[in-house]
Amino acid sequence: MAITYSIGDMLTKLRNASRVGHGSVDLKMSNMNKSILNILKEEGYIKDFNFLEKKGIAFIRVLLKYDNKRNPVINKIDAISTPGRKIYSSYRNMPRIKNGYGILIISSSQGVITGKEAKDKKIGGELICSVW
């Protein structure tokens, strides 16, 4: 079965792998996934990611991050927009995640950025996911 919604697939794999304590997880390569992972790395939710190829198919290997007690750093990661229901927001109406402790990832005219960056730059966009 072909995966048609790579963002949702990526978020589900990250959520499941971190809950069971895996050290890494392999995701299908896409530019959107790469942009989202860049933000997760900058914000400290994952250790790192690198690119690999299996049988001619490009993958991204994500190294997951845990605290000292081996609890996952990603407590919750949820998709907001889906292929059947796109949700957009202006910078004025950008929702706060966990009272400012989480992050919102959006796709804007200036690329994939966090909700905080969107407010600072005064641009809106499609709400992709929330992480805390």
Swiss-Prot record:
Gene3D superfamilies linked: 3.30.1370.30, 3.30.1490.10
GO MF annotation terms: rRNA binding; structural constituent of ribosome
Coiled-coil ranges (or none): none
Cellular compartments per GO CC: ribonucleoprotein complex; ribosome
Pfam families from the UniProt entry: Ribosomal_S8
GO terms under biological process: translation
UniProt cross-references to SUPFAM superfamilies, sorted A to Z: Ribosomal protein S8
Keywords carried by this UniProt record: Ribonucleoprotein, Ribosomal protein, RNA-binding, rRNA-binding
InterPro entries: Ribosomal_uS8, Ribosomal_uS8_CS, Ribosomal_uS8_sf
Family that this chain belongs to: Belongs to the universal ribosomal protein uS8 family.
Job description of the protein: One of the primary rRNA binding proteins, it binds directly to 16S rRNA central domain where it helps coordinate assembly of the platform of the 30S subunit.
Known partners and oligomeric status: Part of the 30S ribosomal subunit. Contacts proteins S5 and S12.
HAMAP family (UniProt xref): Ribosomal_uS8_B
PANTHER family named in the record: 40S RIBOSOMAL PROTEIN S15A
Protein name: Small ribosomal subunit protein uS8
Organism of derivation: Borreliella burgdorferi (strain ATCC 35210 / DSM 4680 / CIP 102532 / B31)
Lineage: Bacteria, Pseudomonadati, Spirochaetota, Spirochaetia, Spirochaetales
